[in-house]
Amino acid sequence: MILVLEKEFARLEKQRKDLLSEVRGLTNVQQTWRPNADSWSLLEVFVHLMTAERNGLTYMTKKVQGIDELEKGGITSDLRLALLNSFLRLPVKYEAPAAAQFQPREYYDFKEIEAEWDQLRKEWHEFLDEFDKDSAEKLLFKHPIMGRFNLEQTLRFIYEHVDHHVAQVKRLKDNPNFPRS
């Protein structure tokens, strides 16, 4: 894997592992608690993150077939990324784009979700490992609102997206009604 992608991916993996360890020691009641019917539980936050990552990877896997036709990222995609990441840093709740929506399940198990996310990140690693510097600069990823990004920009967006939800995890755990066991 080229160095810039390797560094960004390592940063993503550390972030994910830290987030998982925030929730690992909690009971299933705590992990699946929702403050209200319209909110996500801790594990549903993880499912949302995985859904967004899965859909992004699936899209890019298809787009790579025509990579020679794609433009490279530049100042415009850098500016769009800066704007998107600025929005993610605001303490505002956004409706998830359709591509990141998921069908809630009756039951969630932390170990199953962790294993699914581990597998998904292995697939990401294998995908990223195939790119040289030139092809990694192509605008492969498409955010539903902010448009196309190259691979480094995509990994930076994913980091900010996860970070946005790290704050949500903290709010859930700090909620006065959060189950204590």
Where are these regions (language model features)?
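Extreme N-terminal tail/first-helix region
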Residues: M1-K17
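Acidic/histidine-rich alpha-helical segments that form the ligand environment
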Residues: L81-S135
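Hydrophobic alpha-helical core bundles mediating ligand binding, dimerization, or RNAP-core interactions
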Residues: R16-L19, E53, W117, R121-W124
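Short, contiguous alpha-helical
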Residues: W33-L84, E123-E130, D134-S181
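Hydrophobic packing residues in well-ordered alpha-helices of helical domains and bundles
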Residues: L5, L12, L42, I113-W117, ...
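Short coil/turn segments at secondary-structure junctions
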Residues: I2-L3, W40, Q101-K111, F149-Q153
